[in-house]
Amino acid sequence: MAGRSGDSDEDLLKAVRLIKFLYQSSSDPPPNPGGTRQARRNRRRRWRERQRQIHSISERILSTYLGRSAKPVPLQLPPLERLTLDCNEDCGTSGTQGVGSPQILVESPTVLESGTKE
């Protein structure tokens, strides 16, 4: 499903169903605008805290069922000085210059593999 390798579709669907149920079972609409300023502030604060709890539980469900974090792994990119554009094939006259798919050459492909799962 969606190009995920190694993850079972059933696990993904189960996680999505659980998270959907979690959000639907929270009969907690946004707070009403009535009342004093302090009362409104307290209602908003409590509502935001409940929403944060639901979000953190959803992240834990994802990490449990899919075996990975819900947050993306930071990608280590090489310095800009080491990147070059190879335009040997597609550079033509001024009318077609820049058309095509330039290749980006990187010295060490192992830099991009540092975020893989162990």
UniProtKB/Swiss-Prot annotation:
Residues 38-49 have a biased composition (Basic residues). Asymmetrically arginine dimethylated at one site by host PRMT6. Methylation impairs the RNA-binding activity and export of viral RNA from the nucleus to the cytoplasm. HIV-1 lineages are divided in three main groups, M (for Major), O (for Outlier), and N (for New, or Non-M, Non-O). The vast majority of strains found worldwide belong to the group M. Group O seems to be endemic to and largely confined to Cameroon and neighboring countries in West Central Africa, where these viruses represent a small minority of HIV-1 strains. The group N is represented by a limited number of isolates from Cameroonian persons. The group M is further subdivided in 9 clades or subtypes (A to D, F to H, J and K). This is Protein Rev. A motif (Nuclear localization signal and RNA-binding (RRE)) lies at residues 36-52. It comes from Human immunodeficiency virus type 1 group M subtype B (isolate LW123). Pfam families: REV. The modification Phosphoserine is found at S5, S8, S94, S101. The keyword Calcium does not apply. The RNA-binding motif binds to the RRE, a 240 bp stem-and-loop structure present in incompletely spliced viral pre-mRNAs. This region also contains the NLS which mediates nuclear localization via KPNB1 binding and, when the N-terminal sequence is present, nucleolar targeting. These overlapping functions prevent Rev bound to RRE from undesirable return to the nucleus. When Rev binds the RRE, the NLS becomes masked while the NES remains accessible. The leucine-rich NES mediates binding to human XPO1. It comes from the Viruses. InterPro entries: REV_protein. Residues 18-28 are annotated as: Homomultimerization. GO terms for molecular function: DNA-binding transcription factor activity; RNA binding. Keywords: AIDS, Host cytoplasm, Host nucleus, Host-virus interaction, Methylation, mRNA transport, Phosphoprotein, RNA-binding, Transport. A motif (Nuclear export signal and binding to XPO1) lies at residues 75-86.
